[in-house]
Amino acid sequence: MEIKYLDHFNIKASKGQLSEVRDFYIDVLGFKVGFRPKLSGPGQWLYAGSNAMVHLSEDENRTSRKAEDFLDHIAMRCVGVNEFAKKLDEYSIQFRPAYIPEIDLTQLFFKDPAGVTIELNFKGEKLSE
C-alpha cells in the first residue's frame, strides 16, 4: 500500500468567493476549467493537464470560515520558478521564497483569495535575483 501523489483538494465557499478563487487558480496558476460530473451541488473542477486537481464547491454557509483554521497549506510540484515569480509580481501577490540546499528545492509561498497557503516546489531550479 502506498500513496502516489496528491489527487485533488476541495475548496468550499460562497458563490461570490468561489468566483474569485476560481479566477485566481486560472489566471495566476494556469489551471483550466474542465469536466465535472453531476454532483449534488454546484461547483467546478480545475485541471492541471488531465488531472482535476482543484475541486470548487459552492456552500453559502461558508462565508466566514477561515481556511487556515483547518488546512495549513497545499503543495504542488512545478517547473519554471522565475516565470511563476514574475506572474505573482504581475498580480501584486506577495510571496515568500525559500531554498532547501540539501534537496536542491526552491519554494514559493503565498495565499489564495480564500486564505489557503499555496506552496510551489521547484526541484533543481533557483530563483533569479
Task: Give the location of each predicted region.
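Vicinal oxygen chelate
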Residues: 1-4, 90-129
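Mid-chain, well-packed structural core segment of small domains
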Residues: 67-88
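Conserved short beta-strand elements that form part of the metal-binding/catalytic scaffold
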Residues: 33-65, 117-124
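Exposed loop/turn and edge beta-strand positions of beta-sandwich/beta-sheet ligand-binding modules
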Residues: 40, 70, 104
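Conserved acetyl-CoA-binding loop of GNAT-fold acetyltransferases
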Residues: 26-33, 93-94
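N-terminal beta-strand motif that seeds the catalytic metal site of vicinal oxygen chelate
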Residues: 1-22, 72-74, 126-129
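Conserved active-site tyrosine of GNAT-family acetyltransferases
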Residues: 21-26, 88, 115
